[in-house]
Amino acid sequence: YGLNQSVEFKKNIGPQLGELELNKISKVKELNFVEKLSPVYELIKLVSSSQLTNNKTIIGFVGAPWTLLVYMMNRKSPKLNLNENFFEDKYLTDEVLKVLDKFLKIHIKNQIDNGAQIIQIFDSWAGLLKEKNLPYFIYEPTLNLVNYTKSLNIPVICFPRGIKNYKDFCEIVKPDTICIDYEIDPVKINKEIKIPVQGGMDPKVL
């Protein structure tokens, strides 16, 4: 939406995106992007200035580059069908990842400027990737966001849902906290990882 790719949410289906046009998303201006997402920043500012946040920490959220890339190029949830043809178009994936890196950093900065005290990076579809593709699609682009956020003196939580090796992810990407999915043994992961661990609860329990 913020990058001029149409999106709508359909009941029992999820997000449905329009055609990805590189010439359109690469020409998006920062001012227009921020204006489209201004309701997010205004809400964070409203919450941060209210008494509800006394002794509480406000978390800002961004989608990870890989998960956003999947939605933008697959044009729908990959849960039932992932079009893997885009793995073959290196130029397109490179260019889209560059655009995402630029505007995710803008999105992070605006959330922080309006009161977010922690940033959480959601990678809902990290588990779709094979080990050989992790450095290009997940480790490098996520590390860029983590380093940028830390440079603003803001801690980072990462949630690479379904990733095969949380230990490797933490050692490479270096988040301050890792969020695990409910299929991971929290006792085992707590022994392997030397940073705070959260999550691990089946959504059905909630």
Can you name each region flagged by the protein language model?
Residues 66-69, 126-129, 135, 156-157, ...:
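Short, small-residue-enriched loops and turns at beta-alpha junctions
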Residues 1, 60-65, 122-124, 161:
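Short, well-ordered beta-to-alpha junction loops that form the rim of enzyme active sites
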Residues 147-206:
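Catalytic-face loop-and-helix region of soluble metabolic enzyme cores
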Residues 10-110:
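Active-site-proximal, glycine-rich beta->alpha crossover segments in alpha/beta enzymes
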Residues 41-42, 129-142, 182-195:
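Active-site-adjacent beta->alpha loops and helix N-cap segments on the catalytic face
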Residues 49, 74-121, 128-156, 167-176:
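Alpha/beta enzyme core
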Residues 1-20, 26-33, 116-135:
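Glycine-rich, proline-tolerant flexible connector loops at the mouths of alpha/beta enzymes
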Residues 55-59, 118, 177:
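Beta-sheet entry/capping signal
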